[in-house]
Amino acid sequence: MRTVDDRRERLARLIDLARVYRGWTRTEIAKALDRDAGKLLPDSGNPKLDLVVGLADALDWTIGDVAEDLGTEAVVVSPEMDLRSLDREAVQCHRSGNWRGMIRTARQMMALASTAEQRAVACNRAAGGFDGLGLFSRSLPHLQAGLAEPGLPEGLRLMLTVNLANAHYAMWHLVESRAASREVIDTLSDRQVEDRRTQVCRAFAHYVRGSSTRRLAMLDPERGALHASAARPDLQESMVSYEDLADTYADDRYAAMANTCRGAMIEVEVRMGHMGAREAIDRLVVAVERVVDVEHHPPGDWLESWGWWCIFGCNVILHHLPQEELPRPMAIFSNKANEIAERLDNWSLRERAFSMELARRDLTGDDPWILDMEDIRSLVGTMGRFPTFRDRGYRILKSARLLIPEGGPRCAGA
């Protein structure tokens, strides 16, 4: 944690930058920040919100940029640390789900990095940590910074690019996600890929492009069948590639990804008119019934995959069943998706589960939601991570009955 002196020093530096940028005197910067020229810096080093806003205006930065610059923890690097051991530590953090530890280690890697490749690897590790926390808007700049480094090995550049595509996909930036994934696919289209990392990049790129195009069918329903027809070959290619990877490397995570592609293809085949909605729902229900007790089901990629099957089921029901047939199957899928999202602490699944349940209630006119404190925490966290969801989140809060303990915090809808 930063000391008072550290915080004051960093704040003073930003004020000086703003003064130089604007060509202002100390008196002029004080006036712009609505502060006394003799006491620009608070004793604690912690600026109030109006000072952060004033600095952002003076610097032509965003408020978030100023807050991040002021709030970033000092990086502690000891003499015995080296990049190779730190990278191994970051990988271990990823495998164990220690996302904050991964970000901390990535920052130490960045502090020690002296080459473009080392900086790019550190950026990729930091992005992975933010991805794990569902903070995709914070993973994006790290991936973009990594890709801005010159002379990177092709494999590393491809990995950064496909991770960038996935971050955009998670944020519903479908134009960007399709463009970045296409870059990877086109680069590898005319060659035999043998090394494992590049095989994974190609499989993942097809998954992201296919999934992005599948989502585009929901946003552009008039051309939904056309988008679904474009999505299916990518999802098929990704499924086959992940099945091959699972067999070659005996890694069940790849089999789970193949399973997610298989479920997504059911949704697009309904959109294409190649499968009836009721047949698709029956197949999806039978599949997700394998997860009887979410709380005691092993966490991991397979459980997440079944969570996405629930979302595919919701999509089929919402877009292809008569309204009177919605309630029961929709509730099965949305409730199961929410349980899995909570079990895995998966923010992308939470966003979809909340959105699907809201859509169901809008159509059926069911009684308002009843949200307890845990539900509210999940909802607020989802609103912060997905700007496109924020309006829906406020709608839920406004209409829900909130179960808040006596003396607890109040919010809209309470």
Where are each of the predicted segments found?
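Short alpha-helical DNA-recognition segment
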Residues: 20-42
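Flexible helix-coil transition and linker loops at the boundaries of alpha-helical arrays
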Residues: 73-77, 107-119, 146-157, 186-203, ...
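Tandem amphipathic alpha-helical repeat scaffolds
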Residues: 83-96, 118-134, 156-174, 201-224, ...
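Helix-turn-helix repeat elements of alpha-solenoid scaffolds
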Residues: 91-108, 128-145, 171-192, 223-245, ...
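DNA major-groove recognition helix of helix-turn-helix/homeodomain DNA-binding modules
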Residues: 49-66
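Structural signature of alpha-solenoid helical repeat junctions
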Residues: 81, 118, 154-156, 194-201, ...
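TPR-adjacent "capping" and linker segments in tetratricopeptide-repeat scaffold/adaptor proteins
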Residues: 2-6, 68-85, 113-114
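A short, Lys/Arg-rich alpha-helix, primarily the initiator
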Residues: 1-22
